[in-house]
Curated annotation (Swiss-Prot):
Cellular component, GO annotation: cytosol
Family: Belongs to the ThiI family.
Binding site for ATP: M185, L186, H210, F211, R267, G289, Q298
Lineage of the organism: Bacteria, Bacillati, Bacillota, Bacilli, Lactobacillales
Gene Ontology MF term list: ATP binding; CCA tRNA nucleotidyltransferase activity; tRNA binding; tRNA-uracil-4 sulfurtransferase activity
PANTHER family for the chain: TRNA SULFURTRANSFERASE
Enzyme Commission identifier(s): 2.8.1.4
Provenance organism: Lactococcus lactis subsp. lactis (strain IL1403) (Streptococcus lactis)
Keywords, alphabetical: ATP-binding, Cytoplasm, Nucleotide-binding, RNA-binding, Thiamine biosynthesis, Transferase, tRNA-binding
Location in or out of the cell: Cytoplasm
Function of the molecule: Catalyzes the ATP-dependent transfer of a sulfur to tRNA to produce 4-thiouridine in position 8 of tRNAs, which functions as a near-UV photosensor. Also catalyzes the transfer of sulfur to the sulfur carrier protein ThiS, forming ThiS-thiocarboxylate. This is a step in the synthesis of thiazole, in the thiamine biosynthesis pathway. The sulfur is donated as persulfide by IscS.
Protein name: Probable tRNA sulfurtransferase
C-alpha cells in the first residue's frame, strides 16, 4: 500500500481536562513536538485548541510518526491527505484511497468534521455523500458503525479538506515540563531510568544527577549513565546531565563509619547533594528508582533514615513495582540492555557485605559528627560538571561545561 501523506493530525490526551490552563499545556506540547522534530526544518507545526497539525512538506512520514509515538501528551494521531475543498475532487480522492486500503469483506464507516461552516454540505450530508460514493464503486462494501475495519475521516477546514483512515496510539500522559522540574538520581542500574521515564510521562522535566567516584568508578560507567540519559531524551527532549564528584565523600564515609552503615550514610550524603543541586537549579522534587524491599537501602526503615536530611518531596515512581514489572518497562524504553552492562557505580563499589536493613537515625547522626558534612557537600556541589544531552548521539555533538554556569 502506497499512500503519500501531506499532514499528521495530532489529538491531545489529558489536556482536555485542564480548563483555564489549557493554552499553557497546548503550547508546551507544541514546543516539545518541535524539539523532537527540530532536525526536520521542512515541517510546519501548528497547534490549536483541540489538535495540532504537522505539515510534512515532503518529510519522511515514517520517521516523524516514530518520534511522535514517544511524545507525552499525545492521545493519538492520524496521517492525512490534503485535497481541494470541492465535492467532486473529495469523492475522487475517497475512491482512490479506498482502492489502496480496502479489501473485500471489510466493514467501514465515514466520520466527518466540518470546521468550515460555509462549506456546501453539513457533516451529516457529507457522511451520506461519501458513503454513497463508496457504495457506487465498491458494491460489496458493508457499513458498520461500531468498531468497523476502516474508519475514513474527512475534515473540512478553511484551507482544504483532509482525509485519513489511521489512528496511531500516542504515548499519553502529560507534556513534559508542565509539572515543573525534578532532579533524577540516575545510577547505572535498571530502576532509575524507568523512574525517570515515568516522571517524564507525568509532565516532569528532569535533570539527571549522577555520582561518580573515580578511580573507583570508570569512565565507562560514566558514559553508560550518560547513554541512559540519552535514551530518555526521545521522550522529553534534551536533558541536562549533572556529574557529581563523590570520591572524597565516599572515602571519608568508609574511613569513619561502621561497615553496616556505609550504604545508609552514603545515601544520606547523596540526598543532601542532590537537594542542594535541585535548589540551585530551580527543581521542585527529587526522583529516584527505589523499589520497596528490593535491597537493604530500600526498606521503609532505611528510606526513613535517608529521607531525614531533606524536606524536599522525593518521588519514587517504581516503589511498589516488582522487578519483573520494572524490567518490562526498561525493555520497552530501550534502557535494559544498557543498564545490565557490567560497569560498577559508586553504590556498588563500596557496598558492604551486610548492610543495615533498619538503621537507627540516631546512629547515623552520631557517625556523621565525625565528618565535615557541610564542607564535603559544598565541595561536591561546586565541583559538578554539566553536559547537555541532545539525542542518542550526544557524545558526538556536545561538549561539557563547568558548573560556573549554574
Amino acid at each position: 500500500m502506497t499512500v503519500l501523506y501531506d499532514e499528521i493530525m495530532v489529538r491531545y490526551g489529558e489536556l482536555s481536562t485542564k480548563g483555564k490552563n489549557r493554552g499553557y499545556f497546548i503550547n508546551r506540547l507544541a514546543k516539545n513536538i518541535r524539539e523532537v522534530l527540530a532536525d526536520m526544518p521542512e515541517l510546519k507545526i501548528t497547534a490549536v485548541r483541540d489538535r495540532a497539525h504537522i505539515e510534512l512538506n515532503g518529510a519522511d512520514y515514517a520517521e516523524v510518526s516514530n518520534r511522535l509515538t514517544k511524545v507525552f501528551g499525545i492521545q493519538n494521531f492520524s496521517p492525512s491527505i490534503k485535497v481541494e475543498k470541492s465535492m467532486p475532487i473529495i469523492k475522487e480522492e475517497v475512491v482512490a484511497l479506498f482502492k489502496e486500503i480496502y479489501s473485500e469483506g471489510q466493514t467501514f464507516k465515514i466520520a466527518t468534521r466540518r470546521a468550515d461552516h460555509n462549506f456546501e454540505l453539513d457533516s451529516t450530508e457529507l457522511n451520506i455523500a461519501l458513503g454513497d460514493v463508496v457504495f457506487d464503486n465498491f458494491s460489496y462494501a458493508k457499513v458498520q458503525m461500531k468498531k468497523p475495519d476502516i474508519t475514513l475521516r474527512a475534515e473540512i477546514r478553511q484551507d482544504a479538506a483532509y482525509l485519513s483512515f489511521e489512528d496511531i496510539k500516542g504515548a499519553g500522559g502529560m507534556p513534559v515540563g508542565t509539572a515543573g522540574r525534578g532532579h533524577l538520581m540516575l545510577s547505572g542500574g535498571i530502576d532509575s531510568p524507568v523512574a525517570g521515564y515515568l516522571a517524564l510521562k507525568r509532565g516532569v522535566e528532569i535533570e539527571a544527577v549522577h555520582f561518580a567516584s573515580p578511580p573507583y568508578t570508570s569512565p565507562g560507567a560514566l558514559k553508560k549513565a550518560k547513554d541512559l540519559a540519552a535514551k530518555l531524551t526521545v521522550f522529553g527532549g534534551s536533558i541536562t546531565f549533572i556529574e557529581v564528584p563523590f570520591t572524597e565523600i565516599q572515602e571519608e564515609i568508609k574511613a569513619k563509619a561502621p561497615q553496616a552503615y556505609l550504604m545508609t550514610i552514603t545515601r544520606r550524603f547523596m540526598m543532601r547533594v542532590v537537594d542542594r543541586v535541585r535548589e540551585e537549579r530551580g527543581g521542585k522534587v527529587i526522583i529516584n528508582g527505589e523499589s520497596l524491599g528490593q535491597v537493604a537501602s530500600q526498606t521503609l526503615g532505611s528510606m526513613s533514615a535517608i529521607n531525614e536530611v531533606t524536606n524536599t518531596p522525593v518521588i519514587r515512581p517504581v516503589v511498589t513495582m516488582d522487578k519483573n514489572e520494572i524490567i518490562e518497562i526498561a525493555e520497552k524504553i530501550d534502557t535494559f540492555n544498557l543498564s545490565i552492562l557490567p560497569f560498577e557505580d559508586c553504590c556498588t563499589v563500596f557496598a558492604p557485605p551486610s548492610p543495615k536493613t533498619n538503621p537507627k537515625l540516631e546512629n547515623c547522626i552520631q557517625y556523621e559528627k565525625r565528618m565535615d558534612v557541610e564542607g564535603m557537600v559544598d565541595r561536591a556541589v561546586k565541583g559538578i560538571m554539566l553536559t547537555t544531552i541532545i539525542g542518542e548521539n550526544w557524545d558526538q555533538t556536545e561538549e561539557e561545561e563547568f558548573a560556573d554556569f549554574l
